[in-house]
Amino acid sequence: GIASNIATENSITSKYDGILEIDELRAVEAVDEVSGKKHLVVVSRLAEMRIVDPNTKIVLLTHNIPYGSKLFFNNGDSIKKGDVIIEWDPFNAVIVSEVSGKIEFESLVENVTYKVESDETTGLKEKIIIESKDKTKAPAAHIVDENGNYLKNYSLPLGAHVVKDNGDVVKAGEVLVKIPRAVGKAGDITGGLPRVTELFEARNPSNPAVVSEIDGEVGFGKIKRGNREIIVTSKTGEVKKYLVALSKQILVQENDYVRAGTPLSDGAITPADILAIKGPTAVQEYIVNEVQD
């Protein structure tokens, strides 16, 4: 039951009065189409918020700020108990545009790199990225200015639902792609037992995630034999290269900054990876969390 509760959380509401402090934030301004109110859309993956008691400076609450979420306050703002600070889509991971411009798709070919399905709730047709037999095609969305210059590029991961059409004009902060989240993991103890055994025997999971070993900036290399090369470069110039199968969902984009231990692809993180990167305490926390899930 715990996993399904986590999956449907969609906001952070303050339980305290205090001052909001935010670290590592990259965000773009956006306007709510319905209410006309301004908010920020978070485009960094390492942002973290704290609510601090203004008098004692004691930290009352800390929370990661999910990528793609809406942020309704700024760093240093006074927060009242009951204020909704952040909201996100509980059912979909998203890719949002960091810039305004026109969208151009690359390698988006029907029945080769995507299929069309009707959404059950809206009845609208959607383009869903599929595993391509043609390994040279890597679907991507480019945001271009009026002269056709590339402003920003986004890889389209497997299973992504593309919510824009070629040539659409997009504003900074708009959602380009939705990726349905897996709601609930093991479901109950019987479904989760194989995973528990896997954990305690420290076996590597059947579908391991690719994890960055260093803090650094993400870049993409070439496609090699059905794998996408991901290159992480640290501030000191250390470079780590990882190969991710094209059948896996890549969770990062070009120029993202990641910390050691950040998964670059979907799948279960192996206890061995966590031990090597973050040490024994982190492994204990991870095993407890995984068993509870």
Spans of model-derived segments:
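Intrinsically disordered, low-complexity regulatory segments
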Residues: G1-D293
